């Protein structure tokens, strides 16, 4: 890397740091951290453990953002100092090392910039992710199980925890429907980019004639809400049914009616939970999911009204694919919203989804 190129990169990073400091309101964040840390010193801080954990989580999230900014600023300053040393006493080996470190630092800047884009009111929340196969029976149900694995692997790469809240296996293969609770900082902020129809084109392993098949799966993503989020759900509007849980592959099947299904009668929204052995806990989880779905429903309605005002028509049917995964006659995964595409289909199916999310978030926040 030439000296002039290194200088240009460092100047660009300096400007990015200025923009980050302004957009992050770092002074406010630092004041909030001090406020939370003071709250942690109260003698009765741990009396309400759930509230205490929320305070700790908020503090850790703010600290992570501030510390990462400071780390980038420090690395940038180190780069400036090293560049001056090289200009005073040219050293080819040191220059090469600096060029490599600048390239790595640029990647860190890009990753941090993506995290800054997650500034929605619930972006930091855990996520509820649902997969529902379209028409096509076993073929589309198998596609749903492939996407299930993809998102599980993606969550693992982010260090998030994945819980299967509801699972309905396919009769021959795959899944008829599955609901995941994904626990991690910014889980909803990232995964909201995956909401939509996912299309698969491949030679079906279930077709003895070896014909090419097209399958569809709907992915729905909602933020998980804390109990203190006020979303009005009247008891008289609910129908609550219990049934026996049936785990994936027939495992962990309860002999009592611990699984819970809640129907919100006015809207027809239905949620189910069977992950816990306790009916009470399943009901609590189902109510959280119901609130999330009702919130998402309201957001979708607001978006629909905005689209009408703008004269835009949004197709919410199976024709509105957000992404195509083509395994035959060639290999390609393409996002139709951003036109970002890759040829490494196996890598994507193994959880390399972040580049698609990155492209989508950058486009929608421009």
Curated annotation (Swiss-Prot):
Molecular function GO terms recorded: translation release factor activity, codon specific
Originating organism: Exiguobacterium sp. (strain ATCC BAA-1283 / AT1b)
Family, similarity comment: Belongs to the prokaryotic/mitochondrial release factor family.
Top-level taxonomic group: Bacteria
Function: Peptide chain release factor 2 directs the termination of translation in response to the peptide chain termination codons UGA and UAA.
Keyword vocabulary terms for this entry: Cytoplasm, Methylation, Protein biosynthesis
Protein name according to UniProt: Peptide chain release factor 2
Post-translational modification as stated in the protein's UniProt record: Methylated by PrmC. Methylation increases the termination efficiency of RF2.
């Amino acid at each position: 890397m030439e000296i002039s190129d290194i200088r240009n990169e460092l100047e660009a990073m300096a400007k990015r740091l200025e923009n980050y400091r302004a957009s992050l309101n770092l002074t406010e964040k630092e004041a909030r951290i001090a406020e939370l840390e003071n709250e942690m010193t109260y003698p009765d801080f741990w009396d309400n453990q759930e509230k205490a954990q929320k305070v700790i989580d908020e503090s850790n999230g703010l600290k992570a953002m501030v510390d990462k900014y400071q780390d980038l600023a420090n690395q940038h300053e180190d780069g400036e100092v090293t560049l001056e040393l090289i200009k005073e006493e040219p050293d080819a080996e040191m220059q090469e090392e600096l060029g490599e470190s600048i390239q790595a630092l640029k990647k860190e800047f890009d990753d941090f910039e993506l995290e800054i884009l997650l500034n929605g009111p619930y972006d930091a929340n855990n996520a509820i992710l649902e997969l529902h196969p379209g028409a096509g029976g076993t073929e589309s149900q198998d596609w749903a199980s492939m996407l299930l694995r993809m998102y599980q692997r993606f969550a693992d790469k982010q260090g998030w925890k994945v819980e299967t809240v509801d699972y309905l296996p396919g009769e021959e293969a795959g899944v008829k429907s599955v609901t995941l609770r994904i626990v991690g900082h910014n889980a909803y902020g990232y995964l909201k980019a995956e909401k939509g129809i996912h299309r698969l084109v491949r030679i079906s392993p279930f077709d003895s004639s070896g014909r090419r098949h097209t399958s569809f799966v709907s992915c729905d993503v909602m933020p998980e809400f804390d109990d203190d989020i006020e979303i009005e759900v009247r008891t008289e509007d609910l129908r609550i049914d219990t049934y026996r849980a049936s785990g994936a592959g027939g495992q962990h099947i309860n002999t009592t009616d611990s699984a819970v299904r809640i129907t919100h009668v006015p809207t027809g929204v239905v949620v189910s939970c069977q992950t816990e052995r306790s009916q009470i806990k399943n009901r609590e989880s189902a109510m959280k999911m119901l609130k999330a779905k009702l919130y998402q429903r309201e957001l979708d309605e607001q978006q629909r009204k905005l689209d009408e005002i703008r004269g835009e028509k949004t197709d919410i049917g199976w024709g509105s694919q957000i992404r195509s995964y083509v395994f035959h006659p060639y290999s390609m995964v393409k996002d139709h919203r951003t036109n970002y595409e890759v040829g490494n289909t196996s890598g994507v199916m193994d959880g390399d989804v972040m580049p698609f999310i990155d492209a989508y978030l950058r486009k929608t926040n421009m």
